[in-house]
């Protein structure tokens, strides 16, 4: 039952999100794809204060890890805000992580509400194994927004898409 729910969540995430531009910051595993719900290849990735945002990663593991722990921060104006994420990877992925296999997992990030608004910074996501080895590390350029700004961006984006469609630019 849990596996079916996770697979359904992955399917929804895969159809609604496109990979974001990320910088690998020292992953031991080969990180292929980072999907953040609501973000695509456009920079920055807008994150809404107080929202729960699904984040999916896909990577190739060339060695076994029995346990994975996440350390996630949003760094804005030299302030490093710890960002709660759930669940831990081994709650959704069969651990140990298999060697010579492509693995994917989804966690949900809670964006803190006490951060500066309309500021750019970096989301940094680190994953450590049971030996304390950093197996995944990436950072993504983000900009904070509130719910009203999110709704306005969606409205403008949809209006722009409709205008392009009327002009004969389909599929944009």
Segments predicted by a language model, with ranges:
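Short, surface-exposed loop/turn segments at beta-strand-coil junctions that are enriched for proline
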Residues: 62-64, 108-117
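Short aromatic-acidic-glycine turn motif
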Residues: 75-85, 131-134
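Short edge beta-strand/loop segments characteristic of extracellular beta-sandwich folds
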Residues: 54-60
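Short beta-strand elements
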Residues: 132-165
């Amino acid at each position: 039952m849990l596996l079916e729910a996770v697979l359904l969540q992955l399917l929804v995430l895969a159809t609604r999100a496109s990979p974001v531009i990320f910088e690998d910051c020292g992953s031991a595993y080969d990180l292929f794809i980072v999907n953040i719900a609501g973000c695509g290849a456009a920079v920055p990735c807008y994150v809404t204060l107080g929202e729960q945002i699904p984040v999916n990663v896909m990577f190739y593991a060339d060695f076994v890890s029995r346990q994975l722990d996440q350390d996630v921060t949003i760094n804005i104006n030299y302030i490093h805000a710890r960002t709660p994420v759930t669940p831990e990877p081994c709650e959704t992925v069969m651990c140990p992580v298999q060697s010579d296999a492509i693995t994917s997992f989804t966690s949900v990030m809670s964006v803190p509400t006490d951060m500066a608004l309309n500021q750019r910074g970096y989301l940094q996501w680190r994953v450590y194994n049971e030996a304390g080895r950093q197996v995944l590390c990436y950072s993504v350029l983000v900009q904070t927004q509130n719910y009203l700004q999110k709704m306005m961006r969606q409205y403008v984006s949809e209006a722009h898409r409709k205008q392009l469609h009327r002009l004969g630019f389909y599929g944009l």
